[in-house]
């Protein structure tokens, strides 16, 4: 169980995705969402290698937060075209200054980009924060703006204990499902991109 009680008030504050969620007290979320080069550097290298990204590629991060992944991608491929979108004005305003100009506030359910604009669209631990109907729309939007690949990660459980842990700890998830339920949901949503838990 959480060290601090998960009250309606705590959840409501976390779901604003503002200072309290990213950089405030741990009971509201991250407790300090800071850049960790060791983590993001490896993730960016893995994405570059797996999706064969190069300096001519275009990448969109849906739910980019402060843009740490895009920053690392740009460091590794300086001419890569990057864009990020996040629902949090706070996160965008507090993004890495080197890439802030590539980020905007917006919603995953209505991406302001043309069809087939990106070689890769990523969404890292974001989409489970939407209710199923909006989640289905976000998956359709990711598919629409991707001309080639998409990759999402989200929270999923494998057993009752993991489910209980998610229910105790996750403050912002609107959709909690088992891995098998997610797979079925992706099929029903006509999502054919890559995913990981």
Role assignments for model-derived ranges:
Residues 1-51, 56-112, 130-137, 141, ...:
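Class I (Rossmann-like) S-adenosyl-L-methionine-dependent methyltransferase catalytic domain
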Residues 119:
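Conserved acidic residues
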Residues 122:
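A conserved beta-strand element that flanks and buttresses the S-adenosyl-L-methionine
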Residues 125-129:
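Short catalytic micro-motifs in class I SAM-dependent methyltransferases
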């Amino acid at each position: 169980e959480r060290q601090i009680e998960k009250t309606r008030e705590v959840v409501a504050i976390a779901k604003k995705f503002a200072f309290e969620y990213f950089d405030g007290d741990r009971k509201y979320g991250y407790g300090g969402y800071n850049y960790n080069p060791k983590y993001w550097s490896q993730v960016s290298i893995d994405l570059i290698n797996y999706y064969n990204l190069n300096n001519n590629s275009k990448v969109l991060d849906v739910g980019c937060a402060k843009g740490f992944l895009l920053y690392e991608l740009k460091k590794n491929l300086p001419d890569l075209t990057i864009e990020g979108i996040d629902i949090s004005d706070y996160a965008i305003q507090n993004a890495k200054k080197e890439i802030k100009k590539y980020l905007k506030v917006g919603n995953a359910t209505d991406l302001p980009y043309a069809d087939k604009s990106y070689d890769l669209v990523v969404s890292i631990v974001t989409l489970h924060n939407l209710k199923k109907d909006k989640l289905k729309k976000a998956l359709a939007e990711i598919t629409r703006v991707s001309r080639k690949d998409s990759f999402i990660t989200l929270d999923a459980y494998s057993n009752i204990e993991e489910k209980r842990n998610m229910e105790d700890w996750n403050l912002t998830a609107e959709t909690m499902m088992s891995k098998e339920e997610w797979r079925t949901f992706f099929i029903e949503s006509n999502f054919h991109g890559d995913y990981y838990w």
